Amino acid sequence: MATKKTFLVLLGLFFITAGFLLFGNGVGAETLKLQVSNVITKVELLPLDNIEGTVLLPLVRDGTFVLETGELGSMKFIGTAYNMVGKGGSFSGYLVYIFGDGSTIVTSLAGTFWADPEGKLAGLQKGSGELINGAGRFKGIKGTLTMTGKLLKTIKGEIGSKTYNEVILDYTLSP
């Protein structure tokens, strides 16, 4: 009888220990959904010689985001776009999301954009990337980013289109 009780106690301790090791470190997958609005604040137009209508655009985009929870923050994209005028192109660079408490998430981002087939917008875009660094409550972050977006038609005097993006960050935090 004592052997059976000892076995049950040891078995219970095993499951409790396993539970702490697997779930007690706070490393569970999480998701953040952001609605982002941004505008080009800096751009340089570099026509590619011998390829008519094609330009390389080093650029900076600044904007704001809101989470599903209502939390607000700001963002900055620094990157390059390759554009075949009127046909679309590709982009790549880095994003920094800055939260109200000072926490940050840094991501890579690459994607494509194309003309809106309905002609209502300047274009549509889709991209993805990796979460590569975090600070504050996002220290130790790793994960992925997916993004879909709409490029608004430019208004006279604007240096580039405003965008509205829906972004999903799937991540884990290392202890």
Model feature map: region roles:
Residues 2-12:
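Bacterial N-terminal signal peptides that target proteins for export
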Residues 2-3, 23, 31:
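Generic N-terminal leader/processing signal
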Residues 10-22:
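Bacterial N-terminal signal peptides
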Residues 26-175:
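Beta-strand-enriched cores of mature, soluble protein domains
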